[in-house]
Structure formats: C-alpha cells, structure tokens
C-alpha cells in the first residue's frame, strides 16, 4: 500500500511538472529563434542605413541585396541563354527580350519563400534586375561585333562583386551643410552677369548695414548724453553760483539746495547766523534767479516758478536767530527744495486744528 501510494503521488506531481518543463523549454527555443531572426533583420536594416551608395546613387543596389539573392541572380545569369552569343541577342526582337526579362523577374520575387524578405527589399531586387537587363541590352546593342567574352557571366559576376562593399559610415555623418549669407541668391543660376550684380548687391548691403549700425550708435550716444545720471531727481538749470568761502571738504550738500536762493549782489556765508535783513531780501533774489533760466527748460521752470511762489522759501540756516528770539526756527541744516518735510509738518499741524 505504501509503495502504491508513493508511486501515485509521484506520478500525480511529477508528470505535470515534467510536462510543464518540456513546454517551457519548447517556448524558450522558439523565443531564441525569434530573437535571432530579429537580430538578423536589425543587422540588415543597419547595413541599409549605413550604406552610402544606397542613398547617394539609385543605380547601385548591390549593397542592399542579400547574399542569397546574389547567388540566385548569379545562377540565373549562368542559366540565361541570352548571354551565350551577341549575334543571336542582336537579332532577337525587343518584345521577346521584354518577355524574357519579365519571366526572370517573377521567379526572383517568389524565390526563398522559406525566409522572410521585406517588401522594400523585394522592390529593390526587382529594380536591380530591371536595371541590369536594361544595361545588358544597351551594351549588347552597342557592342554587337565584339566577341562573346564581353557578354559572358564572368563579367557580370565581377561587376556585381565590385559593388558589394560594406561601409559603416553613413552619408549623414559626412555631410557638411553650407548655407549662404545672401538668402534667396543661394539658388540663383551662376553666370558672369549675375556674378557682377551679386558683388554690387553685396557691397551695397554691407554699406547699408554699416550706415544703420553707425546711426544706431549715434542715437545711443545722443540718448546717453541727454540722460541725468548724477541725481535721483531731475536737475534744474540755474544761473547762480556758489560762495567762494565754502571749502570743498566741509561742503556736502547738493548744489540745487543753495544755488536757487543765493544772492548775486552780496553773497553771504550759508553757515553763518541768519539775519532778518537777509531774509527780507529773499523774494527779490528768488525772482532774479527765476529770470535766468535757460530756453530748453522754459516750460518746466515756468511751472516750478508758479508752484515755488506759493510755497514758503527755505534757506540753509542754523536753529537760532539773534534778531528774533521769540520765534524758534525748526528747519534742518540739510533741508533742500526736495526734502521740505518742515512744510509738510506745518501742513500736518494745520490739518489737526479744529475748523
């Protein structure tokens, strides 16, 4: 009972496992054959791609041909009775030659049915057969009186073997594109008249480019000269001048903060104690300065003069006045026509008062 049980269990387990292993081995062999076939097809495709003669000239289809197709073509040429003698071929009718060439094309297309041949390879082989037949017919018609050695199969075999050259460098790797600078003149017909006209046009184009570049540079220089890179605010033209007793080391304020309020007749020290007499003469000096503005900034200065007359006039002064002790001057030493925050402070205080 134990022996029969072990045999039954072994058969029940071993037979399915063995059958599965056999089936897996069969599938593996089929897969390996398929891989080999695909590798061979890839090699043929690479040979067709990296073949220079197949892309440059369409008359040389030798490198694109398979070795088995070459053997079939050689055997057909050996068995072909058309190559036996040139005189019989010359006397034959052209319609009979066309019929023979068609008969040769049909078996070549149906040969090697055991192996897979791509459609493009079949077309190439048929074209090669036609080209060979046309070349042989033309050669036999032109050379009729020569001996039959010229039309033998040895010549065709040597010529076909001469064309079978394996090249691993593609045409696209050797091409260097050349593009003309003139554009539409690249496809123009070269001639003596057009060459002279092209030279003249080229010279005129170079001169035009030079002139446009020069005009662009001049415009850029003019714009840069008109720009004001020295101050954040736009400058105002003024005819007043600085005081001579101010040293360059201690004078750090802007020119526009002093020159707009200085007098021409009697210049005073801006760092000295201000006086009431000097302050009373400020409107007259301010009017004189407004009259000396240049013609280029007349519109801007007229607007600024109207606004400046309405505003309070500020002068660089200290925070005390001997003549007017009861009034405290809260003006800053570095205040100018752009940083008039004391006026803003007064306006703010006035706005806080009840109306």
UniProtKB/Swiss-Prot annotation:
Bias type Basic and acidic residues, positions: 92-108, 286-298
Protein localization: Cell membrane; Bud membrane
Residues found modified as Phosphothreonine: 273
Region of interest (Disordered), ranges: 70-114, 276-298
Keywords: Cell membrane, Cell wall biogenesis/degradation, Membrane, Phosphoprotein, Signal-anchor, Transmembrane, Transmembrane helix
Cytoplasmic compartment spans: 30-355
Modified residues (Phosphoserine): 142
Cellular-component GO terms for this entry: cellular bud membrane
Transmembrane regions listed in the UniProt entry: 9-29
Paired cysteines (S-S): none
Membrane topology (Extracellular): 1-8
Topology of the protein relative to the lipid bilayer: Single-pass type III membrane protein
Purpose: Plays a role in cell wall integrity. Affects the cell wall polymer composition in the growing region of the cell.
Annotated family: Belongs to the SKG1 family.
Protein name stated in the entry: Suppressor of lethality of KEX2 GAS1 double null mutant protein 1
Species in which this protein is naturally found: Saccharomyces cerevisiae (strain AWRI1631) (Baker's yeast)
């Amino acid at each position: 009972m134990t022996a029969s049980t072990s045999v039954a269990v072994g058969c029940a387990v071993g037979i399915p496992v063995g059958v599965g292993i056999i089936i897996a081995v069969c599938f593996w062999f089929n897969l390996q054959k398929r891989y080999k076939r695909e590798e061979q097809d890839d090699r043929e495709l690479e040979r067709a791609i990296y073949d220079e003669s197949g892309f440059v000239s369409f008359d040389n289809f030798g490198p694109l041909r398979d070795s088995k197709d070459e053997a079939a073509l050689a055997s057909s040429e050996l068995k072909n009775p058309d190559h036996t003698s040139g005189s019989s071929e010359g006397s034959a009718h052209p319609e009979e030659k066309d019929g023979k060439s068609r008969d040769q094309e049909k078996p070549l297309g149906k040969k090697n049915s055991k192996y897979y041949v791509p459609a493009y390879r079949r077309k190439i082989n048929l074209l090669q057969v036609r080209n060979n037949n046309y070349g042989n017919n033309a050669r036999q018609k032109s050379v009729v009186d020569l001996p039959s050695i010229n039309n033998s199969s040895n010549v065709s075999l040597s010529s076909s073997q001469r064309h079978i050259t394996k090249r691993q460098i593609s045409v696209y790797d050797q091409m260097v594109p050349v593009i003309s600078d003139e554009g539409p003149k690249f496809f123009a017909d070269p001639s003596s008249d057009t060459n002279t006209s092209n030279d003249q046009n080229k010279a005129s184009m170079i001169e035009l480019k030079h002139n446009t570049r020069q005009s662009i540079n001049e415009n850029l220089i003019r714009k840069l000269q008109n720009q004001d890179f020295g101050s954040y605010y736009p400058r105002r033209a003024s005819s007043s001048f600085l005081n001579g007793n101010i040293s360059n080391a201690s004078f750090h304020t802007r020119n526009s903060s002093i020159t707009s309020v200085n007098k021409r007749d009697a210049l005073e020290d801006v760092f000295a104690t201000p006086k009431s007499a000097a302050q009373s003469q400020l409107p007259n000096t301010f009017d004189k300065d407004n009259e000396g503005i240049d013609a280029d900034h007349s519109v801007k200065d007229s607007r600024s003069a109207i606004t400046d007359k309405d505003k309070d006039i500020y002068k660089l002064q200290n925070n005390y006045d001997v003549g007017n002790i009861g009034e405290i001057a809260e003006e800053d030493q570095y205040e100018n026509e752009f940083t008039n925050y004391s006026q803003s402070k007064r306006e703010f205080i006035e706005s806080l008062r009840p109306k």
